[in-house]
Amino acid sequence: MNWNSRKTSAVKKAAILILSVVFFFASSTAISAQKKFAKTYPASKNVRLQLTNRTGTVTVEGWDKSEISVAAYMEAPAANMEPQSLSGTIVINLVKDNQGRNEVGNVNFLIKVPYSSSVDIETRMGNLNVSNVRGGLVRAHISSEGDITLTNIAAENVAAENLIGDIFFDGTISESGNYRFTSTRGNINLRIPFDSSFKLIATAPSTRNISLGDFGSAGMRFVSDGRRVVGQAGDGSATIAVTNQRGSISFIRR
């Protein structure tokens, strides 16, 4: 190997070493910039979780413990967070706790609650996920963009709403229950048992894209030039209302 080759090889090795050091410190900075909050609260079986986020993903999972576990991962600039335990309700309100602050990083939550909890969560932007909950209420609201995924839900009252994004519900329909799903643009998919009893109003005014699947019985009819479906399955004890302005609505047999 001549002198020029050795020089070129040395320069390449030095460049690789410098890039490795830069990557290491950049990764360390990113990790250190993320702040974590973790706390566990004692809870009754019928506890209520009320969470208002600004931006970020919220995941709520039911578990077989009489306590609520809250883990929050805060990106820089870290948000202020002051959870409260008020008469059987755990309240977390990042909008209130950060009033007057122009810049606040995303906050991603992983929360575990008793199976029989009521869950009321909302965010301005980000995904909302709830699974394995069978309390009186499950409410998920996104004021701008994000997907809502509700899995293995057995609540009597369910409300899911966003502007842009998909909504997926997988669960049972309770007698006398109320279920409302609303989106402006995205896909709404409802996966429910075939023997569910409910009155239905489903509206897709722009796309007319409503698929009833196995639920397209004689008790259902399309009206308003296909923009709406009204009807009843079984004894109609529950109520399901679905509105999707510029997206699809689909029913799937569970």
Task: Describe each region flagged by the PLM.
Residues 1-254:
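Intrinsically disordered, low-complexity terminal regions
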